[in-house]
Design a protein with these regions (language model features):
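Conserved SAM-binding loop
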Residues: 58, 82, 106
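Phosphate-binding glycine-rich loop
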Residues: 64-103
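A general structural signal for well-ordered alpha-helical segments in protein cores
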Residues: 40-44, 62-66, 90, 114, ...
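N-terminal "arm"/small-domain region of PLP-dependent enzymes with the aminotransferase-like
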Residues: 1-56
């Protein structure tokens, strides 16, 4: 019988942020995926359709979506990846391409999930400096090594 080897991750717990602005109400936090515009009227109309069947899980392989994308952009259906948001795509890329000891270069003020999924895969996260809060290609190139797998 094979016993799984458990991994211990050195990850900081996510703490949903509260706004430091005390005197304002109805603050919209874009970093928490809140929308300033609310639900689209088109989405509301579709969801109000009584014929819409929401009692089943959606197609987890996104076959219809991938087929439409392949038709629209004239590309191979089997080379299209869909996910439940950018998180899932980042997770898939890290699981597919990273192993323990690999390096991932991310800008210092980038999306938190890049470093979380990299660490889960056992990779070392290397931060590149930004210049005036913009990604600097030259700073990224300085960090590239033989262990770099993802930038």
């Amino acid at each position: 019988m094979t016993i799984p080897k458990f991994k211990k991750y050195q990850l900081e717990a996510y703490r949903p942020g509260k706004s430091s602005i005390k005197k304002m109400r109805n603050i919209i936090k874009l970093s928490a995926n809140e929308s300033a515009l609310g639900v689209s009227p088109k989405v509301k109309k579709i969801l109000s359709n009584n014929k819409l069947d929401l009692s089943r899980y959606p197609d987890n392989k996104s076959k219809r979506l991938r087929l439409e994308i392949s038709k629209k952009f004239n590309c191979n259906f089997n080379r299209i990846i869909c996910g439940s948001g950018s998180d899932e795509i980042i997770q898939m890329v890290c699981q597919l391409f990273l192993k323990y000891g690999d390096e991932v270069i991310v800008p210092e003020y980038s999306f938190l999930m890049y470093r979380i999924y990299s660490k889960i895969a056992g990779a070392k996260v290397i931060f590149s400096k930004e210049k005036k809060f913009k990604i600097s290609v030259s700073e990224i190139i300085k960090k590239v090594s033989k262990k770099t797998k993802i930038v």
